[in-house]
Design a protein with these regions (language model features):
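Hydrophobic helical membrane-anchoring modules
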Residues: 1-15, 190-290
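Acceptor/aglycone-binding surface of glycosyltransferases and processive sugar-polymer synthases
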Residues: 76-92, 101, 113-192, 196, ...
């Protein structure tokens, strides 16, 4: 286990960035992360090794040794996917470090950690917002490099997500997000229900927290100045095809199933639970009659 909690009781650390890593041995921007860590001792970098099959863990351990005061490594024994890596990393940092804000960032640094820090500092000016999320809005003065060939699919998905959330967010899928510390247990205690759209699921959980009509008063979008799509960070076509079904699944889980839930918390569509309850009722009736 390469977990270091020596700084959990210091007052130097203010922010925590979780960085999920899977097979990043040859891709991790090592020098960029190290430069940022050494320049910003107030920021904790927690790298989550998501059961990598290469030497990612050794690379991360080496990075930690170069800046042990604000770099830690959380090793997952097996690959659980980005959503689970982020979830476990967020809970680990929440439980072991006293920070003001926690969030995550992609290992490829499509969004630079310096801009993540700008988001965090901007968030402190608006304490009424529970979360601040990066938004890759193409506009004058911004350097946002996205694959134009994916724009049609992305726009269709974005419209579907807007319908699901019933809110006019510009970008739910950006890998840079930051949350107030008190929201972490509510957002990350339970595993995510979909592997591809956990960002959307975070918004749905925020919606549960703030309410459908007041979600936009609890979440702040931050237009990024720089964002660059990096190599194979793009969603594969076969995964893109699965997204509509994943959205339907989330719609059912978060919006529909609640309307068909019993007082004991079971869904009316849970056949196995319904059979169990029926058998229990029959036994009780038989005991009463005989």
């Amino acid at each position: 286990m390469s977990i270091n909690t020596t700084n959990s009781e210091t007052n130097e650390l203010l922010y925590g960035i979780i960085v999920p890593c899977y097979n990043e041995e040859k891709r991790l921007p090592y020098a960029d992360f190290l430069k940022f860590a050494q320049a910003h001792p107030e920021v904790l970098l927690c790298f989550v090794n998501d059961g990598s099959k290469d030497n990612t863990l050794a690379v991360l351990n080496g990075l930690q040794l170069e800046s042990p005061s604000n770099i830690c490594v959380y090793p997952m024994p097996q690959n659980g996917g980005k959503a689970e890596a982020v979830r476990q990393g967020m809970l680990y940092v929440y439980q072991n470090f006293n920070l003001k804000l926690l969030g995550f960032l992609d290992a490829d640094l499509a969004t630079k950690p310096e801009e993540w820090l700008q988001m965090a500092e901007y968030k402190l000016k608006f304490p009424r917002f529970g979360a601040i999320v990066g938004s890759r809005i193409q506009r004058l003065g911004a350097d946002i490099n996205r694959d134009e060939n994916r724009s049609l699919v992305s726009n269709i998905i974005k419209k579907c997500i807007r319908i699901l959330l019933k809110a006019s967010f510009q970008d739910t899928q950006c890998g840079a997000k930051i949350f107030q510390k008190n929201l972490i247990p509510f957002l990350f205690s339970q595993p995510f229900k979909t592997p591809w759209l956990f960002d959307v699921e975070i918004f749905l959980r925020l919606q549960q927290k703030f309410g459908k009509t007041t979600l936009q008063k609890g979440v702040l979008e931050f237009p990024l100045m720089h964002w660059t799509e990096v190599g194979d960070s793009r969603l594969k076509l076969r995964d893109t095809i699965k997204i509509p079904m994943q959205l339907l699944k989330l719609h059912y889980q978060y919006n529909i199933s609640k309307k068909f839930t019993t007082k004991t918390g079971h869904s009316l569509f849970d056949a196995q639970n319904n059979i169990t309850n029926l058998k229990k009722s029959m036994r009780q009736a038989a005991a009463f009659l005989f």
